[in-house]
C-alpha cells in the first residue's frame, strides 16, 4: 500500500513466501529496498529471488492470497516460538483490556510458532490452533491490516482460545477462579507443579525452600546438575546473580534463552 503496488503475497509449503507485484519500476525498487531494510523485527530473510513476469492478470489491490503447498527451497525454515512482547505484556496487565490476565495472549511479534505447527504452510488450519475457531473480536483484528494481530495465526482470547486449568496429581480438576494464581500459591507453599507449556511439561518448584528442591532433584535424578531458574525481572535477578550488558541483552531478547551466570555474594536461593 505504501508503494502503491498491486498483486498478492502468499505462504509457500516450504515456509517461503511468494510475492507477485505490479506497478512502476521505481515503486517496485522502493518496495524491494523496504523489504530488505525495513522488515519486521522478527523477520529473517535468507534470500530474495526476483524475476520479471509477463502481466497475464490484472490486480485491483494488494492482497494476502490462499497459501500454496508448492515448494521452491531444498529445505524448510520453521519459525521459532517467541517470548511475550512488551505490548502484549501491557495488555495482559491492563484490567480494561479484553485479554487481561489471559495466559495465551499473542500477536505477530510474539507467541508460539514451532511447537504449534503440524505442517506447512504456516496457516492456522495447519496448527494446533485449528481446534479453536476465532470469535468475531479476534477475527476483526486478524483481518485488520493496521492491527499488530493482522494474520497472526495464534490469535485468541478468553472467548475463543485455550483455557488454563489446574488438577491434582490424580487428574481431578481443582475448581478455582484463577488456576494460574492458584498454582503460584501451591508453589509458594512448597508444592511441585507440572506446567504444560507449548512443547511439553516443566516440573517447577520454589527456589527458596529446601524440601521441594530436594524432592525435585530425587524425582529428576539430578543430584548436582543445576536447574534453570525463572525470575520476574532483571531487578530481581540482581539480588542473587551477577550479569553484564551482554547477559542482560540475551535474557530480555525474544529468545529468552537459559544463560549461565555467576552467583552474587548475597546469593540466597536453595541449593
What residue spans do the PLM features occupy?
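Amphipathic alpha-helical segments in well-structured domains
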Residues: 28, 180, 209-213
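Structural motif
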Residues: 104, 113-115, 163-165, 191-194, ...
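Phosphodiester-processing cores and adjacent nucleic acid-binding clamps
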Residues: 99-102, 128-130, 149-152, 162, ...
